[in-house]
Regions:
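Hydrophobic transmembrane signal anchors and adjacent membrane-proximal interface regions, especially
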Residues: 8, 26, 49-53
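Conserved C-terminal structural/oligomerization subdomain of aldehyde/semialdehyde dehydrogenase
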Residues: 39-42, 46-125
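Flexible, acidic loop-helix segments that line cofactor/substrate-binding pockets
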Residues: 1-20, 38-46, 63-68
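Short secondary-structure junctions
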Residues: 29-38
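Helical element adjacent to the flavin cofactor pocket in flavoenzyme catalytic cores
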Residues: 20-28
Length: 125
């Protein structure tokens, strides 16, 4: 059914964790939900795909693996790229996947070198 944007998460425990993260972002002074941010358990454990930005690189949205449709976004100035690589490398003890999206080949090569052990799977585009 192409009218569905997402399916339910796996169980109630996952629903509680994900909806709690959304509620924490809504209550946070340094985070903003820019898309999604809703959930509904009336017919299953549905979490709308959610994008959350934060000005705080220490926000839980960047340190917790949610295994659900939540993506944390940290916007930074290009001049701070080197510092941001350090933040990415130290943000979490765990990282299932990581990715670099850039048009500057030198930035891609630097990030690839600095972050090669930062995640289990690493994508470059």
């Amino acid at each position: 059914d192409l009218t569905n944007f997402t399916s339910a998460v796996i169980d109630e425990r996952a629903f509680v964790k994900l909806s709690g993260a959304i509620d924490a972002a809504k209550a946070s002074g340094d985070a903003e939900i820019v898309a999604g941010g809703t959930y509904d358990r009336s017919k299953g454990w549905y979490i709308r795909p959610t994008l959350i930005t934060s000005t705080n690189p220490g926000n839980d949205i960047f340190r917790t693996e949610y295994f659900g449709p939540i993506l944390g976004i940290f916007v930074y100035d290009d001049a701070d790229f080197d510092k941001v690589l350090d933040l990415v490398d130290t943000a979490s003890a765990y990282a299932l996947t990581g990715s670099i999206l850039a048009t500057d080949r030198a930035a891609v090569e630097l990030a690839q070198q600095r972050l090669r052990f930062a995640a289990g799977n690493f994508y470059i585009n």
